[in-house]
Structures are given as structure tokens and as C-alpha cells.
Regions:
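Extracellular hydrolytic enzyme modules, especially secreted metalloproteases
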Residues: 97-319
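Long beta-sheet-rich domains in secretory-pathway and surface-associated proteins
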Residues: 431-534
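Short coil-to-beta strand junction motifs in C2/discoidin
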Residues: 321-327
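Propeptide-to-catalytic entry region of secreted or membrane-anchored zinc metalloproteases
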Residues: 1-163, 171-184, 190, 213, ...
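Residue-level signal for secondary-structure boundary sites
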Residues: 100, 205, 318, 337, ...
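Short beta-strands and strand-coil junctions in structured, solvent-facing domains, enriched
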Residues: 86, 316-319, 503
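Residues within well-ordered beta-strands of beta-sheet-rich folds
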Residues: 91-93, 309-313, 330, 497
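Generic detector of solvent-exposed, compositionally biased contiguous segments
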Residues: 14-81, 163-167, 171, 243-297, ...
């Protein structure tokens, strides 16, 4: 019931709900039959200590080497017969914690050092070490380390909310896209909180350090949606849902402009689920110079990406616990593969971070009061990665890839009657000066009367991406733009507000000039002048 039936306990969120949202109703989990419980023939540690260099940490000196799946499947078969082939998947939930949710919380977060772990958290054999090694670091408490790690077989502890993540492995054969954030040299994460196949599987109330709660209603209970690349691989969206262009094509077509709807819902009429820009042309397709991850933690590793994607994240549906609304820009590979260098990892999504600087936030506080900061490799470094539209938005509205000769723009934001967000985005080739129809700026006539402060609305027509600037002539008058970019397209006119404010003692009249300069061809300039008066 917890996994499939919406209730007050699971806050209305189910495994089926997640997959139905991501797949637009194509894939779901509508039936789950429970068997057991069964008493395992061996203690928990006999299964949990068989991984991550823990095998020799058993209380009785034996070597841990057992798999829970074999024993539980045998008990199930003896009880009910051989039913395994009757089901698409077998989920084994054991009474205990999933080590992924407790190794840090009941290890280095709870104890200052491995030598300070008290007896109740230690190996029952006092002659054995108090600690055990674990997946990412050298030690955790024995009690935490004896737990099993969730696997795509599919195996989960009672605290684990990452069943959706493991199903991604099991049903669709998609690998992890995550780094090891705990070892040096540190390397930046791939997609972080923005995709369920990375640490977005940890999203939910309380975040990553609340994944020990039973039942799993806190961290990891609301995983992020899937990015464009993974939805394409799974067959959840098709090329028809996207606007797809290529680097070479942009060189001959001029800028491309499109509206993209938030990924948690169906694209609105006339809009797309995302934009794809393929890196085609002469080899190498990805022309990013190789950098050494050993000295540059922000390096994406081996230049091997096939295309850019742009999509919109809105904090609704299963994206509710994403940290921001905005445009998600990423590099993607068609095939999975490791990204090279020290601490390399399987990386097929590489989010472009609008704020690549250190986020400078505390991860946790040790028992002795010492603050532990999030490292450059922590997935939450990408919490502020999204691009926004307009000036003073708290983020960037454009991104230039000089090496791959592309310029991306976040041009405007829109909300419909249901408050669904969509963005107008654009892309152009840095090697093209083509403008399909030059932009023309038109000013309102006659002179406008302004009472202290107000708005002058100019009109833009044409088919191009342009950069705007505004100025005012008149004593004591100020002028501001909320957006530095505009992109009329498809014969549609765009209304551009220019905001004015008059100070006490200002001149009675002023002139406002709006200038639009083509991004592709800076020689194409249009301007218009409006008169205002008090």
C-alpha cells in the first residue's frame, strides 16, 4: 500500500505516480503483490558486510560472502512455489536500513572519529574494530556498515526511497550518472539534483541526510524528474516532442527560437518539451579542449559529448523538491561511458552551471561543533545551476560555448492561467551573421504622460535575437529595462516595456531611446525615440 496507494502516510506520492508522470502515461507500476515476511537463515551482517572492503569485519571471524536475494528467493519458492516468472520485477525489502542512507549519518556525522564510536554502535565482538570501511570513505560505524547497499537486483532497506532509481537501472538499463563526492581529487557532479539517475534521487523533505527515516517519507521520497536525454532513451518522449537543430544547420539558418514548457507536464500548444542542439560537422564533434580533472575539479573530463539540451524545470509534480525554477542547460552523450581521469565516473548528462563558483554552504556540523562545508564535488553545488530570464534574476540569462561555437539565450518567461511556466529560449552559431528579418523598433505616439513613474511600451518586429539598451534624456529622469534580450519571430511583434522614474524637480519633458542590436550581425541596429511628459 505504501508504494502504490496514495495516502496520508506517503503524502499522496507513489512509485506509479512518478513513472506515469515521467512517461506521460506510457509506463507505470499498478500492481504489487506482497509475500512474507520471511525469517532469513543468516544474521543481517552476513549479507551486509560482503561489499566495499567489509568482508573481514564479521563478529565471528568468518568472511561475509552471502547475497540476500538467493536466500529470500529460496524461502519464497519453498513457501509459494516458483512464481518469479509471473512478475516483471521482484522487489526485496528487508527489515533494516539501506546503507546508502545511514553510512554518513551514523558515521562521520554522528562521531568525531572512528575511535570515538561507542560500544552500542560497534561490532559485537569487542576484539574487532569499532568501525568498518564503506563505499565512499574509510570508515563508518559497524552498525551502519553491516547494512546492505540498495541494488538494482532489486534490493532495498525499509528506509530507502530510491526504489524509483533502482527501477531505472532494472527496467531501462540506465546507469548511474553520479560521482564520488568524498574522495580527492574532487570532481564536480554530472547532473546532481536535476535528474533521478544522479543525486536527484535524494530529493524530498530534509534532503540527503534524512534518508534514514522509516518509512521513507523524507529525503529521497520525491525524486527529481528525468532529463531529456534519459526520457529519450526510455522512449518517454520522441524527437517530435523536441525542437532539434544542429551546429552546422545553425550556421546556415540563423538563430532558432522556441518556447519550452515545464517538463513535469505535457507541452502547451505551440510549445516543445525541450530543445536539442547536436554537435555535428567535422570531427571531433565536441571541440572542448581537454582539461585535467586532477587540477580542475570543474572539468567534465574527456571531451565526448554529442549534443546540448535545454529544458524547463518548475517546482511542481515530482520536481517539487528541486531547488529552483528555470532553464536547465546540459551536455549529453548518446551512449554511456566513463569521463576519464582520476575518480572518473559514468557520465552521460553534464549540467551547465549558471553559478560555477563554490556555493559556500555548510553540509553538516560535527558533534564537536566543527562545520563541514559542502565540497566542490557535492551534488548540491548545482542547486543554483538553472538559467533565468531577465536582468537581476539571481542567475544568468545566456551561455556561450566558444569552442563549440554556440551561444544560448534565455529570452523570456511565461505563465499560463494554471501557473504553468514556459520559457522562450534561443540559440545561434557564433560563425554566422545571418538574420532572417532584421528587427525594427517602433515607439509609441504621441507623447506619453507619466505621473512620477511609469512604463513606455515599444514594439519590436522582425525575426532575430537582439540585445537591448535604453537611455533617457531629461534632468532627473531614470530608465530601466527588466530584460536585455528580445527575439521577435514568426512574424509576431513583441512588446517591450521600458520603466521610467522621475525625481522631484525633474524636467517636465524627457525623451526615451530604445536601441536593439542584432546578436548575429552587430551592424544591424534599430532604435526608436519616445517622448514623455509629466
Amino acid at each position: 500500500d505504501f508504494w502504490l496507494k496514495p495516502s496520508a502516510v506517503n503524502h499522496g506520492q507513489t512509485i506509479n505516480g512518478y513513472w506515469m508522470e515521467q512517461s506521460r502515461g506510457k509506463f507505470g507500476i499498478t500492481q504489487l503483490e506482497a509475500f512474507g515476511p520471511y525469517r532469513m537463515p543468516r544474521p543481517l551482517w552476513a549479507y551486509g558486510l560482503n561489499e566495499h572492503r567489509q568482508n573481514n569485519s564479521t563478529p565471528d571471524g568468518s568472511r561475509a560472502r552471502y547475497r540476500m536475494e538467493r536466500d529470500i528467493d529460496s524461502l519464497w519458492k519453498n513457501d509459494k512455489g516458483d512464481l518469479k516468472d509471473n512478475y516483471d520485477a521482484t522487489l526485496r525489502v528487508y527489515a533494516g536500513y539501506d546503507e546508502t542512507g545511514v553510512w554518513q549519518e551514523f558515521g562521520e556525522m554522528k562521531f568525531n572519529s572512528r575511535d570515538e564510536i561507542p560500544a552500542e554502535w560497534c561490532n559485537p565482538n569487542p576484539d574487532m574494530p569499532r568501525w568498518v570501511p564503506t563505499r565512499y570513505v574509510d570508515w563508518t560505524s559497524w552498525k551502519a556498515g553491516q547494512m546492505m547497499w540498495g541494488l538494482s537486483s532489486i534490493r532495498q532497506g525499509e528506509n530507502s526511497g530510491t526504489i524509483t532509481h533502482e527501477l531505472g537501472h532494472f527496467a531501462f538499463r540506465i546507469g548511474d550518472n553520479n560521482n564520488n563526492p568524498y574522495v580527492q581529487p574532487y570532481r564536480r557532479v554530472g547532473s546532481g539534483t536535476w535528474d533521478m539517475m544522479d543525486r536527484g534521487s535524494f530529493n524530498g523533505p530534509g534532503g540527503p541526510h534524512m534518508r534514514w527515516v522509516v518509512p521513507p517519507i523524507a529525503g529521497a521520497s520525491m525524486p527529481a524528474g528525468l532529463m531529456i536525454r534519459n526520457r529519450l532513451v526510455n522512449g518517454f518522449i520522441t524527437e517530435n516532442d523536441l525542437i532539434t537543430v544542429s551546429r552546422e544547420g545553425l550556421g546556415s539558418s540563423g538563430p532558432v527560437i522556441a518556447r519550452i514548457t515545464a517538463r513535469a507536464v505535457e507541452p502547451l500548444p505551440g510549445e516543445y518539451a525541450g530543445m536539442v542542439v547536436r554537435l555535428d560537422g567535422a570531427e571531433p564533434h565536441d571541440r572542448t579542449p581537454a582539461t585535467d580533472p586532477a587540477t580542475d575539479p570543474l572539468s567534465p573530463g574527456t571531451p565526448r559529448f554529442n549534443y546540448y539540451s535545454l529544458e524547463v524545470v518548475q517546482r511542481i509534480g515530482y520536481d517539487s523538491f528541486c531547488p529552483d525554477n528555470g532553464v536547465l542547460l546540459a551536455l549529453n552523450t548518446d551512449e554511456e561511458g566513463r569521463n576519464g581521469g582520476p575518480n572518473q565516473f559514468n557520465c552521460f548528462n553534464w549540467v551547465i552551471d549558471a553559478h560555477p563558483e563554490d556555493i559556500n554552504m555548510v553540509d553538516y556540523v560535527k558533534p564537536n561543533g566543527e562545520k563541514v562545508m559542502r565540497t566542490v564535488a557535492d551534488y548540491r553545488q548545482l542547486n543554483d545551476a538553472l538559467f533565468h530570464a531577465g536582468l537581476n534574476s539571481g542567475s544568468e540569462f545566456e551561455y556561450t560555448d566558444v569552442h563549440n561555437r554556440l551561444h544560448f539565450y534565455v529570452l523570456d518567461i511565461h505563465r499560463n492561467d494554471q501557473e504553468i511556466i514556459s520559457y522562450t529560449v534561443g540559440v545561434r552559431s557564433l560563425d554566422s551573421e545571418i538574420t532572417r528579418v532584421p528587427v525594427i523598433v517602433t515607439a509609441p505616439k504621441p507623447a506619453l504622460k507619466i505621473s512620477g513613474e511609469g512604463t513606455v511600451e515599444f514594439t519590436l518586429s522582425g525575426d532575430d535575437i537582439c540585445r537591448l539598451s535604453a537611455e533617457v534624456q531629461g534632468k532627473g529622469w531614470e530608465v530601466k529595462l527588466f530584460n536585455e534580450l528580445a527575439a521577435p519571430a514568426d512574424g509576431k511583434k513583441v512588446t517591450l516595456p521600458v520603466y521610467l522614474k522621475a525625481s522631484p524637480g525633474c524636467s517636465k519633458k524627457a525623451t526615451v531611446t530604445l536601441t536593439a542590436v542584432s546578436e548575429s550581425d552587430p551592424d544591424k541596429i534599430s532604435r526608436a525615440v519616445a517622448m514623455v511628459r509629466l
